[in-house]
Design a protein with these regions (language model features):
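Short, well-ordered junction/capping motifs at the entry into regular secondary structure
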Residues: 112-158
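An exposed tryptophan-centered "aromatic clamp" motif
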Residues: 61, 77-119, 164-186
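Hydrophobic, well-ordered secondary-structure scaffolds
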Residues: 138, 144-146, 157-163, 167-169, ...
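Short aromatic-cysteine micro-motif
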Residues: 2-85, 96, 132-152
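Short beta-strand segments enriched in hydrophobic/aromatic residues
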Residues: 15, 165-169, 226
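Structural recognition of the beta-strand scaffold that forms the well-ordered cores
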Residues: 10-12, 70-72, 88-90, 153-156, ...
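Disulfide-stabilized, aromatic/cysteine-rich ligand-recognition loop
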Residues: 17-18, 50-58, 62, 68-72, ...
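Active-site beta-strand termini and strand-to-loop segments that position acidic
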Residues: 4, 157, 224-225
Length: 229
């Protein structure tokens, strides 16, 4: 983790992986166990590895907690993403520079779900197919986009995977729903761009709250208070 000096919190430099209690890496292309079945699975972050997609907000929160950390707040996450220049993009500009971060791959008409399911219904099963994040030129290893960073030294906060934060929607018809920031590699900037990109989870099943929504695009990283080290 690195310290964000302006806000006095620590954050993982890279998107996280998940590990089982015995230290075995969880397959990053497959949905992790739900929190009630998850036990001591924990989060770690390294450069040059495949980050965990297919993860829900509560799964991510528990993995951070089991590692002695916590999910970042939206304010913390955006502060780390914007860097000391407080820019819209981590590399210090207020406009997108093509190729700096892993975004805008595969336009809607070429979405990888449609490649696998030409008559896609966009079901939970389809959106969590482990093959999606294994396509060439799709999900990248952590830190692969070496220019997708800032002076704090955090990578991939825009693109690659969108990342769950601790905050929930506070009002309106989606009150209590989970929030993911930063967009993902197939994101087209529909819900703002750069560090302002924001997606709100949907309730996709009456027995599972939005905090358990997950698909190929959802990942996370952890934060911590400096005094916890």
């Amino acid at each position: 983790m690195i310290l964000v000096p302006t806000s006095r919190f620590c954050i993982h430099r890279w998107e996280a992986q998940m590990f089982h209690e015995n230290g075995q890496l969880h397959d990053p292309f497959r949905v992790p166990p739900f929190p009630r079945e998850m036990g001591g699975m924990y989060a770690k972050a390294f450069p040059g590895v495949v980050p965990q997609g297919y993860v829900g907000r509560d799964q991510a929160e528990l993995a951070c907690r089991n590692a002695g950390f916590r999910l970042c707040t939206a304010e913390e996450w955006q502060s780390a993403c914007r860097g000391p220049k407080a820019a819209m993009f981590p590399y210090g500009t207020n406009h997108r520079v093509e190729g700096r971060c892993n975004t805008h791959k595969f336009p809607d008409s070429e979405h990888l779900v449609l490649y696998l399911y030409p008559e896609a219904k966009w079901t939970t099963q389809e959106m969590n197919d482990p093959r999606i994040n294994q396509f060439p030129d799709g999900l990248a290893t952590t830190g692969h986009y070496v220019q997708c960073t800032n002076a704090y030294g955090v990578f991939d906060m825009v693109g690659n995977l969108q990342e769950w934060v601790a905050d929930l929607v506070e009002d309106g018809k989606r009150e209590g729903n989970a929030i993911a920031l930063g967009d993902h590699y197939m994101g087209q900037g529909k819900n703002f761009e750069g560090c302002e990109a924001r997606n709100v989870a949907h309730d996709y099943h009456p027995d599972e709250p939005s905090r358990n929504q997950r698909d190929y695009s959802t990942g996370f990283r952890c934060c911590a208070d400096p005094r916890s080290f």
